[in-house]
Design a protein with these regions (language model features):
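A short, charged helix-loop
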Residues: 155, 215-242
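Flexible, small-/acidic-enriched active-site or ligand-binding loops
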Residues: 141, 145, 193-225
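Short Ser/Thr-interspersed hydrophobic loop/turn segments at strand-loop and sheet-helix junctions
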Residues: 55, 76-81, 179-182, 190-195, ...
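Alpha-helical interface subdomain recognition
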Residues: 1-84, 93, 106-111, 118, ...
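N-terminal glycine-rich flavin-associated loop
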Residues: 90-110, 135-136, 140-142
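A short, Trp-centered hydrophobic/proline-enriched beta-strand micro-motif
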Residues: 122-133
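Short beta-strand-to-turn element immediately C-terminal to the catalytic PLP-Schiff-base lysine
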Residues: 105-107, 151, 177-180, 189-191, ...
Length: 376
């Protein structure tokens, strides 16, 4: 991304975020409060307090301003991603980043004041309840299989169903629930926690960056007023695309930053570690892997910039974001794998964040739609 496609404001914010992540967030990577289900609530609060003090909170949506361009957002989220904890710290992590974008586009003024404002301030977290358990033959990559249903009852709706992989549900204060209604699907805004939404389990997954984990929950007779409808009744699938196309790309932005950091760590290791009488970097097998990574990182950067330009033009970017998600997720997995391989035994330990980036990027090939679904 060059000065021809980004603004001075975007570049200045990206530099500020990068300094904050490298200087302040990186030392937290060894904090024991970072669990298998993400950083603890206390750790999130501490990181966000530091982000506010540094002027790095929700940096892609400056106070009193609209969302920056997708191209400016790309360099900012890439900077945030230089630590796996960076996006959480500066409030650009999934699912909150995508939910804020959706609410900014679709929510009523009252809903924005009640739900969006505290999200933008980083005071609360959110969850997006759309995916359903496979054992129920529910909606996964195919949203048309949606089983959770909402029935009208006077000026209220009653919702029943099960959800899974609702990232961040534990500890979230607002949820966006997708449910079947007559004539289509509808999104509902729900205050959390709610006794009608019961967490059944929080599975252990290979990723561990996002607070609140990826719970499975049962929704039983959840009663919400008609004012809880997000947008229009029956337009849920349309709104999902409003959210998902940009969200696919912001995943790419964040994990590009993480893989840049992994490449830095692996390169530093290769120029210090010796084997067979010379530095690792002087062995072609190692040098080639790091060179291939440099090429892949540049290709990902250009792919993201191209797709961001499509979104900035006002196009939906459905096809383009699928293309970018496939290309970037597959390339970054190879980058992370090469970094582990270059570092050998050190690469599979938790002495650095390289092994974590590898695990997170592996999950990225599934999250926001598996590669095979986007290709199809």
């Amino acid at each position: 991304m060059s000065e021809h496609t980004t603004t001075p404001q975007g570049r200045e914010i990206a530099v500020r975020v990068e300094h904050f992540v490298r200087d302040v967030v990186v030392p937290f990577e060894r904090d024991p409060r970072w669990t298998s289900h993400g950083p603890s609530p206390e750790m999130v609060d501490e990181l966000r307090s530091l982000a506010r003090a540094a002027g790095a909170m929700t940096p892609h949506i400056p106070a009193g301003r609209d969302h920056l361009s997708h191209r400016d957002t790309a360099i900012i989220l890439r900077a945030a991603g230089l630590s796996p904890l960076g996006p959480v710290a500066v409030n650009v992590a999934a699912p909150d980043e995508g939910n804020m974008f959706l609410l900014g586009k679709v929510a009523s003024l009252e809903q924005k004041a009640r739900f969006l404002a505290p999200l933008l301030a980083g005071r609360i977290r959110s969850a997006f309840l759309i995916t359903e358990p496979a054992e129920d033959n529910g909606a996964g990559s195919d949203p048309s299989m949606l089983r959770t249903a909402a029935e009208p009852d006077g000026d209220h709706w009653v919702i029943n169903g099960r959800k899974c992989f609702s990232t961040g549900l534990l500890g979230a204060k607002v949820g966006i629930v997708m449910a079947k209604t007559a004539g289509g699907a509808t999104m509902f805004l729900v205050d959390l926690p709610n006794p009608a939404i019961r967490v059944e389990r929080v599975p252990e997954t290979i990723d561990s960056t996002l607070p609140g984990g990826h719970p499975t929950s049962r929704i039983e007779n959840l009663r919400v007023p008609s004012s809880a409808v997000l947008g229009e009744v029956g337009e849920g699938f349309k709104y999902a695309q409003v959210r998902l196309s940009p969200a696919r790309l912001t995943h790419c932005m964040r994990w590009l930053g993480a893989c840049i950091r992994a490449q830095e760590i692996a390169s530093e290791y290769a120029v210090k570690r010796q084997a067979f009488g010379k530095l690792l970097i002087d062995h072609e097998g190692v040098g080639f892997k790091l060179a291939e990574n440099r090429i892949a990182i540049q290709q990902c950067t250009l792919m993201i910039d191209w797709c961001a330009g499509v979104l900035d033009s006002g196009a939906s970017g459905t096809t383009e974001s699928s293309m970018a998600k496939v290309a970037v997720s597959e390339a970054l997995f190879r980058v992370a794998d090469n970094c582990v391989q270059v570092m050998g035994g050190a690469g599979v330990t938790r002495d650095t964040i390289v092994e974590q980036v590898f695990r997170e990027v592996r999950a990225f090939r599934i999250y926001a739609g598996p590669t095979e679904v986007h290709l199809w």
